[in-house]
Structure formats: structure tokens, C-alpha cells
Amino acid sequence: MAQPTAVRLFTSESVTEGHPDKICDAISDTILDALLEKDPQSRVAVETVVTTGIVHVVGEVRTSAYVEIPQLVRNKLIEIGFNSSEVGFDGRTCGVSVSIGEQSQEIADGVDNSDEARTNGDVEEDDRAGAGDQGLMFGYATNETEEYMPLPIALAHRLSRRLTQVRKEGIVPHLRPDGKTQVTFAYDAQDRPSHLDTVVISTQHDPEVDRAWLETQLREHVIDWVIKDAGIEDLATGEITVLINPSGSFILGGPMGDAGLTGRKIIVDTYGGMARHGGGAFSGKDPSKVDRSAAYAMRWVAKNIVAAGLADRAEVQVAYAIGRAKPVGLYVETFDTNKEGLSDEQIQAAVLEVFDLRPAAIIRELDLLRPIYADTAAYGHFGRTDLDLPWEAIDRVDELRAALKLA
């Protein structure tokens, strides 16, 4: 069947939990969760580096808790699947170095005693906690999928999750932990997905694997399975370009193939390039860092805007100054998809009325002082169909519509 004419092609990628950068994200968030579990007020900024045979954990922490970081690192590596020198990395025998210092007192003072509190004295409790850094954060939502995510990144994540599942469950034998997926969709003149154009999967594997066999297995157990599970068969009826390990063999992977670092997959973590990004990474950071908590809040805001029927797509930007509680800026963009005769400025005013975007309020409303972060380290922080994440709640729809005087 001939494919519909495409106005544009858009591509997003995902990676598996065995990718070197994702190993680092997982280790950093595992340490964060362990500290929050024992001391919810922990301040954590932990970065991880992995390379051949060794893991380096560095950063700054303020906490009353003690956790055995080397053991946490080893357990996470083994859980991911790096449990033997044959696969290129062994969590049981690799080196682990830890260099963690105390959080800067100046940063701590700015978070614990905001500029508003120092200047005005008697302020609301939520005005006392300042942002942990300056910066800008974006949130995005679209109604092109049930999870309010862009279809390219949503499908790329589903493919990565399934690739890991078939490896761990032995559905497709001889796979190793490292892997990447990439999806290209055609979009029509109405800027809606019209058909699936290209799927790329690169997966680490054992030396004896035949490439033709691997392609057959991954087409059946990963690509076809995901297309059916996602319910997008109508977008996959034409000729789809499928590329499995297009570089050839992929035996050497994980930290032996490439060094990894926390925070290097920020587009994979968010919207696959469909929305703007403020530049701040998430993993290893406690929610006093607005890089993380405010980005989650912006997703919450954007998703509720779209779920309320105010727009088909929404992108929301917020900005903070270090040590200040109140945001210094908020911006709503609906890309001319706004409904009900509303302007972006009206939607923005409703957001300010309905959502409290001070860091302390975000942390309280989303209940962020909990060990919920390690599960987000791979396969995206937004639109997760396999996790119950508080920033994915559609719980302000009625309030937004009421603020805009809509029935």
C-alpha cells in the first residue's frame, strides 16, 4: 500500500537501561532514592561516570542518612544485566570509586532561607524555600497519543522497553544489555502523524548471533509486538524501512564500548526533540533542584492544559533565580491549536491561578520527597504507561476550565 504524502518527517530516539549513559543515570537515581528513603530532606547532587572496568561516583550531599554506595552501584549493574566479563562489564568485580562532599553552605542557605524571607522577614511558609539554582524548564503535552506524548518518542520508548523485556525474559536469546531504538514518523498538513516511516534498532548481542536471524526475531518479538500493543496498526500499513544493527555486529557494548555519564540523554528523557529543553538534567538530583522538580511540574501543567481541551498541544516554560521562591517567568505556547476561542495569554493567566509554582509547593503537591526516581532513569520521565508518576496526574482540568469560565 502506498504511503500518504508526508509534509515532514520527525524522528526521536530512545536507549535501553544498558546504554552507558543510562547506567549512570540509574546509579545516580538509585543513590538518591536510597538517601531519600532514610532521610526525605536529603539534598543530593550525584554524578556517575562509567568506563572500562570502573565506576566513579562524585557529587555533593547533605543528609543524616548513611548508605553503602559501592553496594548500591554493584546491585544496579547486576540488575541491568552487567554480571559477567563476557558481556563487557561485571558489577561484582568492577572497581567503584566514590568522591562525595558536603553541599555548599551558600547553596543550602539560599534554599533553606529564600531571598524573599531574608528581605521581607514574615512570609508564607512556601516563600521560605528558594530555588536550588537559576534556570529555565519546559513542559509539553500533545493529544496525539493517549499518554499525551509525541508519538515518535512514545514508540521509541516502547521499543526500548520491549527490547529489554525480550532480553531479560529470554524471549529472544543471545541479547546483551546495551541498545538503542529510533523511530521516524511522517506528519501531514494538519501536523498529525500519518504513518510510520522508519524504525532503527541497534542491540548488543553475543558473538555467535546471525544478523539475519536477529532481524527476524526483533521484527516479530519487538517491532510487530510493540505496534500492536500501542494500537497503531493503522499507521503501519504501508512499507516501513526497518534497520536492525545497520552498522553490522554489536558485540562490544556497555561501558567497555563507550564511557557513560549522568545527564547526557536529556532529549531521550523528555520529549524526543518535539519540545524545547532548558538544558538541565534530572538524574541524581533531589527535588530542591528545579531542573528536576520544575520540569516535572511543567509537564503536569501542560498535560492538564491539553486534557482540559484548551489546546491540542501545549508547551510551558518557567524560570527561576537561585534562592528565590517565586518564578521569574512563565510562558504558555499552544502553537495555534488553542480551543474555545482562548488566547495563550488567557491560558497562562489560568495556569497562574490554578498552579502554585514555588519550589516548596511543587514538592508538596507532587509529593516528591520519596524514593520514586530510579524507575524513571531509563525509558523516559514522562508519559510512562508502566509507572504511576504524580506529575502525570490529570487532576486540575476542572479548575483550569473554571478559571477560564468554561462549562
UniProtKB/Swiss-Prot annotation:
Provide the gene name from the record: metK
Question: Tell me, what does this protein do in biology?
Answer: Catalyzes the formation of S-adenosylmethionine (AdoMet) from methionine and ATP. The overall synthetic reaction is composed of two sequential steps, AdoMet formation and the subsequent tripolyphosphate hydrolysis which occurs prior to release of AdoMet from the enzyme.
Q: Where is the signal peptide?
A: none
Q: Does the keyword ATP-binding apply?
A: yes
Q: Which CDD domains match?
A: S-AdoMet_synt (cd18079)
Which keywords does this Swiss-Prot/TrEMBL entry list?
A: ATP-binding, Cytoplasm, Magnesium, Metal-binding, Nucleotide-binding, One-carbon metabolism, Potassium, Transferase
Flexible loop: where is this region?
Answer: 103-113
Name recorded for this polypeptide: S-adenosylmethionine synthase
Cellular component GO terms, alphabetical? cytoplasm
